[in-house]
């Protein structure tokens, strides 16, 4: 089952790397411009390296990313996610829906995660459309009803701080 996850992904490392690449690209293009005037079109694109937000629409086959069920039997089926309440998102601090758990209801509104699980979400099950948010840098990831991932830490879970109901694109600007 392929689900579309809309990701706005920024990290301090990427910002620093992007600025570094941009400065080097600008210097190289300015040198090329002095040596060859035929590069004007390339030089006009230098500002493309300074981007406020990274907007990615990724097609992710979530079932193929599920961890294989570890048991004494030779089952090759993906690990089925546990049940989660209606209009809720269940978060877990360990792979394969293990460890500390936290159930978020969309009726709670915008919620900062408790310190015991903040920046430590490794797997999740979603029965609602929610926006996962981090602040420094400001990054959002859209999660839709029916999505689940048993190894979310590699994507975003190690910086997840806040949940908001609905779509990320509907959040008011500068709300956070």
From Swiss-Prot:
It comes from the Eukaryota. Belongs to the Dictyostelium gerABC family. It comes from Dictyostelium discoideum (Social amoeba). It is found in: Secreted. Keywords: Glycoprotein, Secreted, Signal. GO terms for cellular component: extracellular region. Residues 26-46 are annotated as: Disordered. This is Uncharacterized gerABC family protein DDB_G0290879. Glycans are attached at residue 120. Residues 1-20 form the signal peptide.
């Amino acid at each position: 089952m392929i689900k579309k996850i809309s990701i706005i992904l920024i990290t301090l490392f990427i910002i620093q790397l992007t600025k570094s690449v941009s400065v080097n690209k600008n210097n190289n293009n300015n040198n090329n411009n002095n040596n060859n005037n035929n590069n004007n079109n390339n030089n006009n694109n230098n500002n493309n390296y300074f981007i406020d937000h990274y907007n990615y629409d990724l097609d992710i086959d979530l079932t193929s990313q599920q961890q294989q069920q570890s048991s004494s039997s030779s089952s090759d089926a993906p690990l089925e996610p546990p049940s989660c309440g209606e209009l809720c998102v269940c978060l877990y601090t360990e792979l394969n829906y293990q460890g500390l758990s936290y159930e978020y209801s969309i009726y709670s509104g915008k919620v900062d995660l408790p310190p015991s699980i903040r920046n430590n979400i490794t797997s999740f099950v979603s029965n609602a459309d929610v926006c996962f948010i981090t602040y420094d840098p400001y990054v959002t990831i859209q999660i839709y009803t029916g999505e689940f991932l048993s190894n979310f830490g590699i994507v975003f879970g190690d910086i997840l701080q806040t949940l908001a109901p609905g779509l990320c694109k509907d959040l008011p600007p500068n709300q956070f």
